Amino acid sequence: MSERMTPIPFKQLMTWIKEEHDNFGTVFGVNAPYVKKNGKTLPLFKEKLETPFGPAAGPNTQLAQNIVAAYYAGARFFELKTVQKMDGDDLAACINRPCIWTKDEGYNCEWSTELYVPQAFDEYVKAWFAIRIISRLYGLGAEDGFMFNASVGYDLAGIKTPKMDKFIEGIRDASNTPIFRECMEVGCELFPELDGYIRATPSRICDGVTVSTLHGCPPNEIEAIASYLITEKHLNTFVKCNPTILGYEFARSRLDSMGYDYIAFDDRHFREDLQYKDAVPMFHRLKELAEKNGLEFGLKLSNTFPVDVKANELPSEEMYMSGRALYPLTIEMANRFANEFKGALRISYSGGADFFNIKQLFEAGIWPITMATTILKPGGYGRMVQLGNLLDGCEFKPFAGVDYEAVARLSEEAPTNFHYIKPIKEAPDRKMGKGKELPLIDCFRAPCKSGCPFGQDVPEYIELCGKGLFLEALQVITAKNPLPFITGTICAHHCMDKCMRNHYECPVNIRGTKLQAAEGAFEELLAITEMSREGEKVAIIGGGPAGLAAAYHAQKHGLQATVFEKRETLGGIVRNVIPGFRIGDDAIDNDIALIKKTGAEFVMGKEAPDVKELKAMGFDYIVLACGAEKKGRLDIEGNVMNVIDFLYAFKNGGELKLGRNVAVVGGGNTAMDAARAAKRAEGVEKVTLVYRRNRRYMPADLEELELAIEDGVEFMELASPVKQANGKLVCNKMKLGDKDASGRRVPVETGETVEVDADTVIAAVGEKVDLDLLGRYGIAADAYKKGNKKYGDVYVVGDASRGPATVADAIADAKWVIEDITGREIVADIPEEAKPDKEEALLRKMKLQMPGKCEADRCINCNTVCESCVSVCPNRANVAIAVPGKEMRQILHVDYMCNECGNCAHFCPYTDGRPYKDKFTLFANEKDFEDSENNGFMVVCTKCPKVKVRLGGAVKEYILDGKTGLGDLEDLMLTVIKEHGYLLG
């Protein structure tokens, strides 16, 4: 595969647009258009805009199809990708691949156009014509309701070179260029009904330009470039500023305060780049110069921010930051300049602009607004439809100045705004897990289901809840999960970690929706649950979540379950240890009532018989769900209490004399429970959680950590306990070293000590499996292996198998055991109503939406339609193809449109999924085919039809006659040839 893109000829481009739109209702994969209906426009220079936003100079404005896709979705201001004297092969050779990283904030290591300058010019002219044609053809808006803005750099000498001068003259008047004439003639040929309209296409492509300079460019050079463009080329001019103008101390402090302390940069660029004291008088001069020449001058805020590569984000030493981490810097730049000029200086904005701030920016008088990172995430260009509809509700009026007081408020609010703050902990891996390779066909999967240890059918029950079918939803849930109240309240919800909505704003509230279903239909489900006492007998030792789940599944699948619980109550750790402020007894009782209704029997209040006795009693299988009850120890001197003992006493009314100051040692969820409980204990004034690493590396779930902070728990990070005495806990002071195998940085002693007030120390350092107890059931200590669940006809599940784990893990183990005993997979019966409307699912993927009453409105139904790789590709190189006989559209990668930016790989739910390398690929010709290792094909003859195919490294030619043995791949290739011929050129 080559990273070089091949521009699409104008005739093919327009044929593609027309056939795709007419046959499938989409344009370059954008599933719905923005249509301008209210007629409102904004004047800019001598032109007008139907919307004040569009794609920033970058990957989304490099090729004609990118620009057209953005227009179709609602963009009307296009900052074209920067052109400079270095171009084509010379520039492409300097760009390491992949070159885009947008998992959260954005990074890139690519800069100006990878095309040759004349090619770039051609792309912009093709897009100019294409937009005018489709605006009229499909009634999307006025033919003059959009504008292009060229971006040029990086020094005056380069801008004055013949090829750059030709480019600039071309955008001023393209009428005599070959591409302009070609587009006009081809357009008239393809759309004769628009002949006069097409021939009236304006030849002035751009009325304005944005100056982009490299870091370290001297002020006099910047001024010389802008002056030249104003006085010699008579172009309205924006000058792009770097965030380094804020100063190192401010940038470091603001980013650190928002959780971006891991972003590495020194003060080099801050010292070498344009300084604020030099910028202000220069911008005054340039503003006056533009006005003198009857033009406008403004600032483009801001350029991307140079930072160091520290975690192998990209294969380079330095990269450029964008997205939500850039917003707090760029809005402060806007604040300073708006205040300096009292709002009189126009600001073109691009620095983390998205759905959550664009309205405020626009209403503050900051426009045009361009963006890159948000449209490189799932939803892609389609996100702009929502932006257009949002801003349609705003007042459109000529620029009368920036509301600098409003901008000051935006900057002041940015450091505490939820949308821009980095969470305390590193984001969990959003991928589905190891061992799941991206297939060539039928790749759509729901990552949430993969994130659930027992494979809960999440999208299905969410869809049912959205339709008010709570009983059906609860039946889907309990087919695999018999503890809907417990898991609907305290589940660690790793499904939500995987939710694709994380790439939009925040995950679907899957756990809350489960509880909604449980509360909405529990009585109905209980009434129709049948009792059974048939089949082989299963003895279950332990009445916690694992034992309860095993009993339920045994009863539902033809077995007889008897649970032996040594306590008088069921529920295990959830009942006896997890504090009541996290889960009430009613929730636990409901789940137990459901399990009892199945006919499971319970023997309470005494130790379970050993293996011999159980066998003598006629039990065929034994399931050990006895937890991990061997207490963990913190090996230090002093007043130290085990966390389970403490939580048990706290929940069950035991006497606690903790003193005024409590230290909890540990960083997991149990430690958070203990700290929050201690805050509520009588006589306790201060609780400090002590951990040897920092918060970012605590194993606790983010939610539990945040709740502890909300409750007023204090934190002593980088501290390892040594001893407790005289009301103090003495700790070794630690520092973080290199990362270990888990990805967490290893704590290293510094040789210093620190103290914290502590009358009592609660040790939350992990419980262990009681091997002596397992020995009573025939599992010798040397035979026990952590994670192993089967020892002959004795099974070990939950914490007894894994060590301390989650309720969901316990349910997963229980489900697996019953599947192993019965030899049948436990699956849910999915009703037809659980299947969403595919078109609605596609439209949901285009919208950002915070949680609300009905989470079904936010679920994007990845089990039905994924297509993330289609939406995030700036070049439209991943195409969704409807193949006859296949329920869902298949993904075809188009080689000649791809530059290996790698963006699609970040959002493919498969762990190592790289659609640009792993999906079946269409090649334009023999050379491209040979230059790649991708599985894929090239068309040798469309009439035969004959193709050349590579699969697993083997190359072979086929006549597609139904006898190739290629199955679904043959159907895909035939569909491309017969129904998508525009892809072939």
Residue ranges and their predicted role:
Residues 540-562, 603-612, 629-634, 646-702, ...:
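Rossmann-like dinucleotide/flavin-binding elements
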Residues 76-86, 243, 360-387:
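Glycine-rich phosphate-binding active-site loops on the catalytic face of alpha/beta enzymes
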Residues 23-38, 247-343, 378-396, 637-638:
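Glycine/Thr-rich beta-alpha phosphate-binding loop at enzyme active sites
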